[in-house]
Amino acid sequence: LRTHHATVRMRLVRAQVRRVLRVSAAAGGQTAFSDGFPLLLISEASLSDFNSRVSSPLPMNRFRPNLVVAGCGAYAEDQWRTLRIGETTFHVVKPCSRCKITTTDQETGYRGEEPLTTLSTYRRKQDVKAPCGDAVDVFFGQNICHQQQGRVSKGDAVYANFWQYPWYLGGYWHFC
Protein backbone atom coordinates (compact mmCIF):
# COMPACT_ATOMS: atom_id res chain seq x y z
CA LEU A 1 0.00 0.00 0.00
CA ARG A 2 1.44 3.35 -1.00
CA THR A 3 0.79 6.70 0.61
CA HIS A 4 2.24 10.14 0.11
CA HIS A 5 3.93 10.61 3.44
CA ALA A 6 4.30 7.41 5.39
CA THR A 7 4.24 3.66 5.44
CA VAL A 8 0.88 2.23 6.33
CA ARG A 9 0.71 -0.68 8.74
CA MET A 10 -2.28 -2.95 8.36
CA ARG A 11 -3.68 -6.03 10.05
CA LEU A 12 -6.60 -8.29 9.32
CA VAL A 13 -9.55 -7.73 11.62
CA ARG A 14 -11.97 -10.62 11.55
CA ALA A 15 -15.49 -9.68 10.68
CA GLN A 16 -18.69 -11.48 9.92
CA VAL A 17 -17.99 -13.06 6.54
CA ARG A 18 -21.56 -13.03 5.23
CA ARG A 19 -24.00 -10.13 5.14
CA VAL A 20 -27.55 -10.04 3.88
CA LEU A 21 -27.93 -7.73 0.88
CA ARG A 22 -29.95 -4.56 1.40
CA VAL A 23 -32.05 -4.72 -1.74
CA SER A 24 -35.06 -7.02 -1.86
CA ALA A 25 -34.41 -7.62 -5.58
CA ALA A 26 -31.42 -9.71 -4.56
CA ALA A 27 -33.78 -12.43 -3.24
CA GLY A 28 -31.85 -14.16 -0.50
CA GLY A 29 -28.45 -13.05 -1.77
CA GLN A 30 -25.43 -12.64 0.46
CA THR A 31 -22.12 -10.88 0.06
CA ALA A 32 -18.76 -10.89 1.80
CA PHE A 33 -15.96 -8.30 1.78
CA SER A 34 -17.81 -6.16 -0.75
CA ASP A 35 -19.56 -2.85 -0.33
CA GLY A 36 -23.07 -4.02 -1.02
CA PHE A 37 -23.18 -6.56 -3.84
CA PRO A 38 -20.91 -9.44 -4.77
CA LEU A 39 -20.18 -8.31 -8.33
CA LEU A 40 -19.99 -5.14 -10.41
CA LEU A 41 -20.21 -5.24 -14.20
CA ILE A 42 -19.17 -2.43 -16.57
CA SER A 43 -18.79 -2.39 -20.35
CA GLU A 44 -15.71 -1.07 -22.11
CA ALA A 45 -18.02 1.03 -24.29
CA SER A 46 -19.44 2.80 -21.22
CA LEU A 47 -15.95 3.68 -20.02
CA SER A 48 -15.05 4.87 -23.53
CA ASP A 49 -18.13 7.10 -23.61
CA PHE A 50 -17.30 8.50 -20.17
CA ASN A 51 -13.69 9.15 -21.22
CA SER A 52 -14.90 11.05 -24.30
CA ARG A 53 -16.49 13.55 -21.90
CA VAL A 54 -13.42 14.29 -19.72
CA SER A 55 -10.10 16.00 -20.47
CA SER A 56 -8.01 13.24 -18.84
CA PRO A 57 -9.28 9.69 -19.45
CA LEU A 58 -9.61 7.41 -16.43
CA PRO A 59 -8.68 3.71 -16.34
CA MET A 60 -11.28 1.01 -15.71
CA ASN A 61 -9.70 0.21 -12.33
CA ARG A 62 -10.97 3.55 -11.01
CA PHE A 63 -14.46 2.01 -11.01
CA ARG A 64 -13.37 -1.36 -9.52
CA PRO A 65 -15.52 -3.76 -11.59
CA ASN A 66 -15.28 -7.53 -11.21
CA LEU A 67 -16.51 -8.16 -14.76
CA VAL A 68 -15.74 -6.06 -17.84
CA VAL A 69 -17.59 -6.81 -21.07
CA ALA A 70 -16.82 -5.78 -24.63
CA GLY A 71 -18.73 -5.77 -27.89
CA CYS A 72 -21.87 -3.93 -26.80
CA GLY A 73 -22.91 -0.29 -26.96
CA ALA A 74 -22.25 2.28 -24.25
CA TYR A 75 -24.49 1.71 -21.21
CA ALA A 76 -26.08 -1.40 -22.75
CA GLU A 77 -25.65 -2.98 -19.31
CA ASP A 78 -28.30 -0.55 -18.00
CA GLN A 79 -30.89 -2.54 -19.95
CA TRP A 80 -29.91 -6.06 -18.91
CA ARG A 81 -32.04 -8.08 -16.50
CA THR A 82 -30.16 -11.38 -16.52
CA LEU A 83 -27.05 -12.55 -18.28
CA ARG A 84 -25.23 -15.76 -18.89
CA ILE A 85 -21.46 -15.80 -19.11
CA GLY A 86 -19.77 -19.17 -19.45
CA GLU A 87 -21.48 -21.59 -17.06
CA THR A 88 -22.98 -18.91 -14.84
CA THR A 89 -26.23 -16.96 -14.89
CA PHE A 90 -26.31 -13.53 -13.24
CA HIS A 91 -29.20 -11.38 -12.05
CA VAL A 92 -28.79 -7.63 -12.54
CA VAL A 93 -29.92 -6.08 -9.25
CA LYS A 94 -29.52 -2.32 -9.74
CA PRO A 95 -27.27 0.40 -11.13
CA CYS A 96 -24.20 1.05 -9.00
CA SER A 97 -24.31 4.41 -7.24
CA ARG A 98 -20.76 5.74 -7.17
CA CYS A 99 -18.94 7.08 -4.13
CA LYS A 100 -15.90 9.28 -3.53
CA ILE A 101 -13.53 6.30 -3.66
CA THR A 102 -13.72 6.57 -7.45
CA THR A 103 -12.07 10.01 -7.22
CA THR A 104 -8.83 8.48 -5.88
CA ASP A 105 -6.05 7.71 -8.36
CA GLN A 106 -4.99 4.19 -7.38
CA GLU A 107 -1.42 4.72 -8.59
CA THR A 108 -0.70 7.96 -6.73
CA GLY A 109 -3.34 8.11 -3.99
CA TYR A 110 -4.31 11.65 -5.01
CA ARG A 111 -7.98 12.60 -5.04
CA GLY A 112 -9.62 14.75 -7.67
CA GLU A 113 -13.16 15.61 -8.73
CA GLU A 114 -13.54 13.01 -11.46
CA PRO A 115 -15.38 10.85 -12.27
CA LEU A 116 -18.20 12.16 -10.07
CA THR A 117 -18.30 15.67 -11.54
CA THR A 118 -18.78 14.44 -15.10
CA LEU A 119 -21.06 11.53 -14.18
CA SER A 120 -23.34 13.98 -12.35
CA THR A 121 -24.01 15.75 -15.66
CA TYR A 122 -25.61 12.73 -17.32
CA ARG A 123 -25.84 9.66 -15.03
CA ARG A 124 -28.24 10.62 -12.21
CA LYS A 125 -31.18 8.52 -11.02
CA GLN A 126 -33.65 10.01 -13.50
CA ASP A 127 -31.17 9.53 -16.39
CA VAL A 128 -30.68 5.80 -15.81
CA LYS A 129 -34.14 4.93 -14.45
CA ALA A 130 -32.59 3.60 -11.24
CA PRO A 131 -35.08 1.68 -9.07
CA CYS A 132 -33.61 3.12 -5.88
CA GLY A 133 -31.18 5.79 -4.76
CA ASP A 134 -31.39 9.50 -4.19
CA ALA A 135 -31.68 12.16 -6.89
CA VAL A 136 -28.12 13.26 -6.05
CA ASP A 137 -26.64 9.78 -6.64
CA VAL A 138 -24.66 9.16 -9.81
CA PHE A 139 -24.54 5.71 -11.41
CA PHE A 140 -21.96 3.80 -13.43
CA GLY A 141 -22.04 0.03 -13.90
CA GLN A 142 -24.47 -2.58 -12.66
CA ASN A 143 -24.52 -4.49 -9.38
CA ILE A 144 -25.10 -8.16 -10.13
CA CYS A 145 -25.47 -11.45 -8.23
CA HIS A 146 -24.71 -14.92 -9.55
CA GLN A 147 -27.63 -17.34 -9.49
CA GLN A 148 -25.51 -20.49 -9.27
CA GLN A 149 -21.87 -21.42 -9.17
CA GLY A 150 -20.03 -21.90 -12.43
CA ARG A 151 -16.91 -21.01 -14.34
CA VAL A 152 -16.49 -17.68 -16.13
CA SER A 153 -13.46 -17.26 -18.39
CA LYS A 154 -11.93 -14.38 -20.27
CA GLY A 155 -13.36 -14.31 -23.78
CA ASP A 156 -16.65 -16.05 -22.91
CA ALA A 157 -19.68 -14.92 -24.88
CA VAL A 158 -22.23 -12.90 -22.93
CA TYR A 159 -25.94 -13.53 -23.46
CA ALA A 160 -28.17 -10.76 -22.12
CA ASN A 161 -31.90 -10.76 -21.42
CA PHE A 162 -33.36 -7.25 -21.39
CA TRP A 163 -35.73 -5.64 -18.89
CA GLN A 164 -39.31 -5.62 -20.14
CA TYR A 165 -40.21 -2.09 -19.04
CA PRO A 166 -41.48 0.68 -21.35
CA TRP A 167 -38.17 2.55 -21.24
CA TYR A 168 -36.16 -0.56 -22.17
CA LEU A 169 -36.02 -2.60 -25.33
CA GLY A 170 -37.21 -6.16 -25.04
CA GLY A 171 -35.57 -9.26 -26.38
CA TYR A 172 -32.61 -11.55 -26.08
CA TRP A 173 -29.21 -10.44 -27.17
CA HIS A 174 -25.80 -11.99 -27.79
CA PHE A 175 -22.50 -10.19 -28.20
CA CYS A 176 -18.73 -10.81 -28.07
Spans of model-derived segments:
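Metal-cofactor-dependent catalytic cores
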Residues: 1-176
